[in-house]
C-alpha cells in the first residue's frame, strides 16, 4: 500500500502498522498535516525536477528478519517546486523535519540526495521517538486500530504496541527531550495525538450504537421465547410474593452466567412477585371478561335456578369459593344476567308479593333455606 499527496505543495503522513513481509498487520491511515510557517524561508533547489521522497520515518524501525510488528510514520513530500511556488505557499509542518536537508538541496547534486534523505530520516525518527508524547501518539494510533477488531487481533495490537514502545524507549533513552525544546515538533506531536483521538471517537460511535441496537433486538427475541409454562412451573407454593431475606446465595444473579442460566435464576428469584402480579391483574380484568370456567359454573347455577335466580349470601360465598371470584364480581354478574336474560313470570310476581312465601323476597338474606346443590320443589 502507498499514500501521499499528489499536489506539489501538500504534505501528508501515512501511518502503517506492521511490515508487509513480517506477518504483522498492515492497515494504513492517511491524515493531512497541520500547516505551520516554521522554516518557510528555505527554498528547494528549482533545478531539481525529480520528485524525491525526502522523508521516511519509522517508529520504531524493526528489522524484517525478526518478524516483530512495527509502526511506521511515512511522510511523502513532493519536492518538484519552483522558487515562486515556494514563496507563495505556506510550508507544511512536516517541512520542518527536512530542514537539515535543505542546505544539501541548495548546494548539492542528485547523487547526494539519497544519503542526505537517509540521514534526515534517521534524525527525525530519533527526535520523534525521544519526544515525551511519543508513547501517547503510539497508543492513540493503536487504539484506532482496535476499534471493532476481534479479541485476538486486539491482543496482537497491544503486544506489538508494548514491544514498539519498549524498543523506542531503549533507543531514545540517551537523547530524550522535553517539551519546549522544539516547538514545531511539539506542535506536530500534539496535533497528531489529538487527531488520532478524535478519529477513534468517530470510529467508536457508530460501533457502539450498532452494538446497543443488537443487544435490544436480542433481548426482545429472548423475551418472546419465554412461554407460559415457564411461569407456571415456578408459581406453585410462592404466590404470596418473595422477600429479599428469603433469597439465598444460590439465587443471587450472576452477571457472568449464560443466558439460559440467567433466565432460570431470574424466574426462581422473582416467581413470587410474578404470581402476585398475575393475581392482581386477574382481579382488574374488565367487567364481563370473567374466566371461562367461572362463567360456566355461574351459568350452571343460573340454569338450575332460572325461575328465581337470586342467590343467597351463603350461596354467593360458595360460588366465590368454587369459581375463584369475589362476591362483588358475582353480584355484578347476576345483576347483568337478570337484566339481559330474565323476566319473572306473572305467577312469580304474585308469589313475590305473597307473605306466605317469605323465602322469595329479594331483600331477605335468609330467603333460601336450602343448600346450594338442592332446589326447592317450586323451582
UniProtKB/Swiss-Prot annotation:
Domain of life: Eukaryota
Cellular component, GO annotation: nucleus
Chain residue ranges for the region called Disordered: 75-125
Compartments (UniProt record): Nucleus
This protein's UniProt keywords: Activator, DNA-binding, Homeobox, Nucleus, Transcription, Transcription regulation
Tissue expression remark: Expressed mainly in embryonic tissues. Weakly detected in stems and hypocotyl.
Keyword Metal-binding appears in the UniProt entry: no
DNA-binding region: 282-345
Matches recorded under CDD domains: homeodomain (cd00086)
ELK domain mapped to chain residues: 261-281
Presence of the UniProt keyword Nucleus in the record: yes
UniProt family annotation: Belongs to the TALE/KNOX homeobox family.
Known role: Possible transcription activator involved in early embryonic development. Probably binds to the DNA sequence 5'-TGAC-3'.
UniProt protein name: Homeobox protein SBH1
Provenance organism: Glycine max
